[in-house]
From Swiss-Prot:
Gene name linked to the record: lolD
Higher taxonomy: Bacteria, Pseudomonadati, Pseudomonadota, Alphaproteobacteria, Hyphomicrobiales
The protein's name: Lipoprotein-releasing system ATP-binding protein LolD
PROSITE patterns cross-referenced by the UniProt entry: ABC_TRANSPORTER_1, ABC_TRANSPORTER_2, LOLD
CDD domains, sorted: ABC_MJ0796_LolCDE_FtsE (cd03255)
Naturally occurring in which organism (per UniProt): Agrobacterium fabrum (strain C58 / ATCC 33970) (Agrobacterium tumefaciens (strain C58))
Primary location: membrane
Family matches, as SUPFAM superfamilies: P-loop containing nucleoside triphosphate hydrolases
Domain ABC transporter: 7-227
Task of the protein: Part of the ABC transporter complex LolCDE involved in the translocation of mature outer membrane-directed lipoproteins, from the inner membrane to the periplasmic chaperone, LolA. Responsible for the formation of the LolA-lipoprotein complex in an ATP-dependent manner.
Residues annotated for ATP binding in this entry: 43-50
Gene3D superfamilies xref list: P-loop containing nucleotide triphosphate hydrolases
Amino acid sequence: MAKKTVLRLTGVERTYGQGETSLSILRKADFELKSGEMVALVAPSGTGKSTLLHLAGLLEHPDAGEVLINGAPCNGLPDEARTAIRRSDIGFVYQFHHLLPEFTAVENVMMPQLIAGLTQAEARKRASALLDYMRVGHRGEHRPAELSGGEQQRVAIARAVANAPLLLLADEPTGNLDPETAHYVFDALEALVRQSGLAALIATHNHDLANRMDRRVTLADGKIVDF
């Protein structure tokens, strides 16, 4: 079965500032990401990795070009529609977990599901299953401060996919972890992506992890290129 294109960028441009102080990050950039595909985004700091992830995640608007999620153009959509797409179709993972400290692990994973309209019972059942899959189910009733760094990040990954998104965007998801823990967390992330058929774009400086993905891209002269 042919894989579906989940994310497409066509001729995307993004510039910050104006005049002599302007900084062009993306120049007529093209990119495609298909379901079940893991792509590593490897580039030096300051070259636009976060900008690319923000555009793909509908957190920023391109100055030109088009961003399509699951074949649907997203340019010009009102904020409410963009928010709805983010909630239903896109999951985000960051270097720092951003878990809500006052809630337990299972409650953190329940949160996006409750916002999406699931009942407490439905949300708790799925949250518990995801935590079990990420091998932290036994820590479900603990708050983030009581978890190790690797456990926190696995909870954050479970939260990111709680609403079964089509697209996962991760910005240095193992960057704050020691090498052994980073590989352990990535093992869980990779298994989840492969099992669910997610499309995943993962920014990382870790070349060992990048080499485990389906392909690698970088940013060069405002373009997104394979290497």
